[in-house]
Amino acid sequence: MNQILARFTRQTWLSFPFGVQKMNFWRIKSPNYDSDYKDSYINGSLEHPYGLPGVECDVCGETWGGSRILPIECPEFYRKHKNITSAWPISRIEHESLQKELMDTLQIDSINEPFIGLRPGDEFQPCFLDVPSRPRADFLWASLGSLIVSERIKDIHVECCSSDITVCPVNIRKVGKRDAKLPPPMPFTGEPEDIINEVPITKNALEINSYFQILILKESGFPPGGTPRKTCSGCKRPDVDNSTRELRMTQEMWKGDKIFFLATTLHIVVTDEYKQLIERYRPTNIVFEKI
């Protein structure tokens, strides 16, 4: 357990000799769909019902919660805890107490400083997938901050970049009977996320191919203009000036990983090596955008 959290915080810096070939970096993302309905129809949505709430910090005055997904199962005892099933923010003191309880239960002692080992908004496993159509694609963009992939794509990641990721099972909860190639139905409410409530559902989820959640463990150095001006001594929230931050990747920011987050964002970035490897398998429902 301690090793899992350590991998989320470890940083590896590399130096580059003169004459090294300039690398390209790519953001991986979903294709552009005709409509939000098509997006929801193909990709569905992923739910993590258990997680840490947001925090109201009395030191910096900010109310916030992050989007980190942990590969750690929520302990059964906490699955009915009001502050684990609701993201509604609580005070910094309450948050610190809840974190200490969880770290004791999970036997996390190597990174036990409050707001470092665990953070506001952290989400636990398990996760549940609802897709209004029968999922066929290699990539499903059902979750921010992680990848939902077919078994063959999961196997490629485990083989080529196991030190950069960890893999969690996805529990398939609701799946529609229709093929995603058909036009998406218009839900009565008009909201794309409600399509799942108005389509015929496959009764036997075991008929659906397995999907897996890939969690990215690494991140780049800070982007130009994105170095935090300060970090709150209470909740450890970094203060980044979004007006000066540039959403681009440079070679100086790279730490040697094949897949990683662009620091201060949820943009998933990959190297040329990763792109070339994945493209050999002709994956579906993914695009590479130079960043």
Question: Where are these predicted regions, by residue range?
Answer:
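Short N-terminal edge-element motif at the start of the domain
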Residues: S97-S143
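Short coil/turn motifs at helix boundaries and re-entrant loops, enriched in small/polar
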Residues: L147-I153, I268-E273
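Short, intrinsically disordered, charge-biased short linear motifs at domain edges
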Residues: Y37-Y50, N209-G225
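Extracellular-facing segments of soluble proteins and assemblies that are Gly/Ser/Thr-biased and enriched
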Residues: G145-L147, K154-L217
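Residues immediately within or flanking Cys/His clusters that coordinate Zn2+
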Residues: G51-C57, R229
